[in-house]
Amino acid sequence: MKKSAIALSCVSVFLFSCAAPKSITQPDSTTPLAQTVKPNELSTPYTLKTGGEISEHQKHLTVDKALLRFSFDFDKEILFGDTTLTLNASKPQSTFSVDLDTRFTLQDVWLNGERLPNDRYSNKYGELIVSSSSLVAFPATLRVVYSGHPRTPIRAPWDGGVMWEKTAEGQPWLATAVQGEGCDLFWPCIDQPFGEPNETELYITVPKPLVAATNGVLINTHDEGDNRTYHWQTKSVHNTYGIALNIAPYKQMTTQFTSIYGNTYPLTYYYLPEKEDKAKALFDELPEMITFFERMIGPYPFADEKVGIVQTPHLGMEHQTINAYGNQYRKDDGGYDWLMQHEFAHEWFGNQLTNDNWDHMWLHEGFGTYMQPLYAQYLHGNEAYFVKLNAQRKGLANAHPIVSNTLMSEEDVYEKGPAGDIYAKGAWVIHTLRGVMGDDAFFRSVTELVYGRTDPKPGNFKPIFANTQDFIDIVNKHSESNLDWFFDVYLFSAALPELTMTRHKDGVTFAWKTDNNLPFPMPLEVSINGKITELDMQTVFSLPVSQFDTVIADPNSKVLRYEQRYEDYKAWIKENSNTKKK
């Protein structure tokens, strides 16, 4: 369970309201320039990973609040930041750390309102280590004033950083996308799943008429000359990589939505005005999508803030309450924008429910991907459901287990682990599990996974952490049986189970084959001349049939299994691709 916000001390409140400098565009005038910590040219390997091994200096830390102040020089692509973190720990300690990209120049570091001399902190590799002459009692405030040119992604959002783009009219268009590398690409944070602040407050200063859209609720704006400061505040825990900056000459669509639970909350879309008719059409898709998720999973988790969508120069990302959208208003054969639906799914699977270790990232992406066929079924029926599932089935790699049960960074998941299988294979595992459990038990399990309870209502839940074992325990409870065998084969093994079907003179024999001969008593539907029989498959199973009978195993595609036809198709695609290159 994610920890609830802890009340701030009077000292912390004073620092937040009084200690921020009037300008964060230059080093404080009392700081000798010789003491300014210079940046490195490139981000370090430490910065470019998120999650994984936890630094000894961070193991006992949590973040109660993050106060983030940003301003920009758009011509020079410089970000100026002033961050105050309220940190907590179970016991006093003299040394602790947060993470920040070494590309930034450190101008000031303050601990509990006192500026630290240069020899009391270092940021050699992207871990900003702070040392005190005495034990620090917690909660404590750490303020970092910094500036520099942040990492610019080559291919966002797959490559992370701050994008400095231009609109068609030549206006600045800035967006952040840092899921793969982490929050430390543009603000000091604890770059781990557990590093989520219980509360985040943002002050974003931009030249008029630019608009700054971010997480949470817009408290107010303040004009000073040619600049405008947007003051935003979250009301719940937010993923660190989900804290996002979006700046452009946005227009705004807003409406109030009443959910199936009876509560009302705002829907907002920040968009560029060039394609207003298409923006309106996209915005009109939101109410039906929300109703789908609330019917199938449970209440929208952040109704006390907003449902937010923002147009970005990259494809998209699940930034909490300000989902990034850059799919160019494309439609697919499902009749909806799949990208917006997928990213919005992460409000439930990723933001309300967060994996406690990136090794369990399939809980975000597998469920997020399964929501597209499920939504197609909700809108159009079973045929549309299987069209989506079949499209997803074609690309499975099955090279690594989906879950390794080790501590992993997100990079490890993609470079050393299951990579794209956390999406489509994860979705197919979920589809198969639904068939085994039946809809009632399955959807109760999913709801409990997301909310920690089966009866969520607005106001009776908070964001939670979970992992694969948590889900297995929930599934076993609601199925009233032990389905460990299912997860042993589908999640903890790489290879798919294979069905052998052997025809002989007077019958047909079915058997499951798995790596390491793992038990796999998966029930199997068999169609004989159009009549369906279900086999329990506790062991080898034989049926009497003649050589003229038509026998189809799993005619309704309920079971994810090895099928040679998909391997042949992948081989043909690869061969055809190589031929075109020549």
Model segments located where?
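Beta-strand-rich binding/interaction modules
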Residues: 106-111, 483-484, 504-556
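Acidic/His/Gly-enriched intrinsically disordered linker/tail segments
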Residues: 235, 365-432, 436-437, 453-456, ...
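N-terminal, polar/Ser/Thr-rich
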Residues: 18-80, 165-172, 194, 484
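Amphipathic alpha-helical substructures
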Residues: 419-508
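A surface-exposed beta-strand-loop module
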Residues: 34, 96, 101-165, 542-547
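Glycine/proline-rich low-complexity spacer/linker segments in large multi-domain proteins
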Residues: 55-58, 136, 146-200, 255-256, ...
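Zinc-dependent metallopeptidase catalytic helix centered on the HExxH motif
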Residues: 178, 287, 324-387, 446
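Hydrophobic helix-coil surface modules that form long, contiguous segments used
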Residues: 81, 178-179, 190-341, 370
